[in-house]
């Protein structure tokens, strides 16, 4: 076959730079889009921010400063004693028996009270330093001999995120084989490290951690000795919630055991968790939903991103054929493309958000249990867009509603068939499971099979394994772990 050149006339789809930019902006989150716009403002002199947006931002800054000054004045006039603050941060004595240690100890609860000095490292959920960093900082402030300091460093290095040692003391002793160090000396240093904040770090097990915390309580604390004996002799039964056997073994009355458990629940089984190593993630709602005269209204959040305009003074300099004029015209075209892409993004986002609100109207009226099943294709057909476009516009985009802030993808869920031939959203089923568990008899918690039967009575057929999966996604423990002491 002889090679030759041929001309062929045809049509094909081509993605223009403008379309590429519009698609890229569509999938950016609000914070990413703000950064993109800021970079464009810095690189393109033809772009400006509209004055109304700047005035709003300035007003917000002034408002924040005024609030800070007012707060400072209140603090100056009404100083509060640190002991009062500590008392306010103490755990309520009305906690239910089944409350777990993780539920009792929140991120802002510490073993040494509240740090009031701004220069002091604050670990109550506000710092991003690691647990090891915080312990090393305290080590530098504590007098140790060179040998003991080396041992303390080895201990701190072996502590996991929960605050427990990951190696045995014998293993640490072996690491000092070349030095004349005894196991008793390592244990003595460990005891000193355990007094660091948060109290209980460097413990070898849960029993060691909890007993150390109990040792700091005043001797006059009610039920203190009973709590210590329960942890020493029956911690396994306590973990299994075998209250009947505990009563039999300890000879405690049911009311007395209740008091002992309430004391133990004030302890922190994972002291290292008080150190937060994760940065807080902030979201800015892209759209707002509110009810006005009985109708649900959807609007774009005007403060989510700056509103751009063309700098007309620079644009007027684009006439002519000089290099400067060509530069102005090039940037002018890019500025127009960006503004048009942002307008297109807002139009698409608003259209999709309105469709979601219309489809999930019952959710906004009645809550999660009224959520309807909905997939991306349902919205794509309604707004006459491709499913991939709907996926982009609902990813990392947030809606502010009277019920809270939700990612747009939250409103999409699979469906489960009902006996009546209808469909029920998996989100609604999760809400029903949460409601059933909240109302269950705590002496005899509902098993997954029983929950499936109760849903079947409502015409919703769900397999036991599906119930277990939904329950775990809600962070609800199995029935064996939800049992409480009456």
Curated annotation (Swiss-Prot):
A motif (RPON box) lies at residues 463-471. Keywords: DNA-binding, DNA-directed RNA polymerase, Nucleotidyltransferase, Sigma factor, Transcription, Transcription regulation, Transferase. GO terms for molecular function: DNA binding; DNA-binding transcription activator activity; nucleotidyltransferase activity; sigma factor activity. Residues 375-394 bind DNA. InterPro entries: RNA_pol_sigma_54, RNA_pol_sigma_54_core-bd, RNA_pol_sigma_54_DNA-bd, RpoN_core-bd_sf. One of its GO terms (biological process) is DNA-templated transcription initiation. It comes from the Bacteria. GO terms for cellular component: DNA-directed RNA polymerase complex. Belongs to the sigma-54 factor family. Sigma factors are initiation factors that promote the attachment of RNA polymerase to specific initiation sites and are then released. This is RNA polymerase sigma-54 factor. The gene is rpoN.
